[in-house]
């Protein structure tokens, strides 16, 4: 039910005022070829649109006088929806990919994790690298700091880090952002 109300609200934002529902006495008219026709009384603008068998659509009510366009409303509405769909397609959502490891990690395992991070960063994702401690291992935090410095150095060509590292319980993590090219 909640999704339908969201859709309805987004539809209302895209609704345009057309023809007799325009309540301004004087308007600036743009025709279907994007030429400015000038400033008209609303009655004359409606007659002009009716003669061309098109609609009068309020484009901008913030200007003085408000801007209206003489166009086919159905085609205009379709074009607006198509534009919004295209804009939505082009949006890229940044996701956070997490790579977990221990502070004592072998060279090959380390290289595998670095390669994963490189792959994620090239795709434009943020990478969260977590170092996990078990039991009393938390006392070896200096070894973890050295590992984090090594990771930062290994990925310095592709990533920049927000902070040096954050400590959360028995985990230490660092957030890496892809470098802007």
From Swiss-Prot:
<protein>
    <recommendedName>
        <fullName>Translation initiation factor IF-3, chloroplastic</fullName>
    </recommendedName>
</protein>
<dbReference type="InterPro" id="IPR019815">
    <property type="entry name" value="Translation_initiation_fac_3_C"/>
</dbReference>
<keyword id="KW-0150">Chloroplast</keyword>
<dbReference type="Pfam" id="PF00707">
    <property type="entry name" value="IF3_C"/>
</dbReference>
<dbReference type="InterPro" id="IPR036788">
    <property type="entry name" value="T_IF-3_C_sf"/>
</dbReference>
<comment type="function">
    <text>IF-3 binds to the 30S ribosomal subunit and shifts the equilibrium between 70S ribosomes and their 50S and 30S subunits in favor of the free subunits, thus enhancing the availability of 30S subunits on which protein synthesis initiation begins.</text>
</comment>
<dbReference type="Pfam" id="PF05198">
    <property type="entry name" value="IF3_N"/>
</dbReference>
<dbReference type="InterPro" id="IPR019814">
    <property type="entry name" value="Translation_initiation_fac_3_N"/>
</dbReference>
<keyword id="KW-0648">Protein biosynthesis</keyword>
<dbReference type="GO" id="GO:0016020">
    <property type="term" value="C:membrane"/>
</dbReference>
<dbReference type="GO" id="GO:0043022">
    <property type="term" value="F:ribosome binding"/>
</dbReference>
<dbReference type="GO" id="GO:0005829">
    <property type="term" value="C:cytosol"/>
</dbReference>
<dbReference type="InterPro" id="IPR019813">
    <property type="entry name" value="Translation_initiation_fac3_CS"/>
</dbReference>
<dbReference type="InterPro" id="IPR036787">
    <property type="entry name" value="T_IF-3_N_sf"/>
</dbReference>
<keyword id="KW-0396">Initiation factor</keyword>
<comment type="similarity">
    <text>Belongs to the IF-3 family.</text>
</comment>
<dbReference type="GO" id="GO:0009507">
    <property type="term" value="C:chloroplast"/>
</dbReference>
<keyword id="KW-0934">Plastid</keyword>
<dbReference type="GO" id="GO:0032790">
    <property type="term" value="P:ribosome disassembly"/>
</dbReference>
<dbReference type="InterPro" id="IPR001288">
    <property type="entry name" value="Translation_initiation_fac_3"/>
</dbReference>
<comment type="subunit">
    <text>Monomer.</text>
</comment>
<dbReference type="GO" id="GO:0003743">
    <property type="term" value="F:translation initiation factor activity"/>
</dbReference>
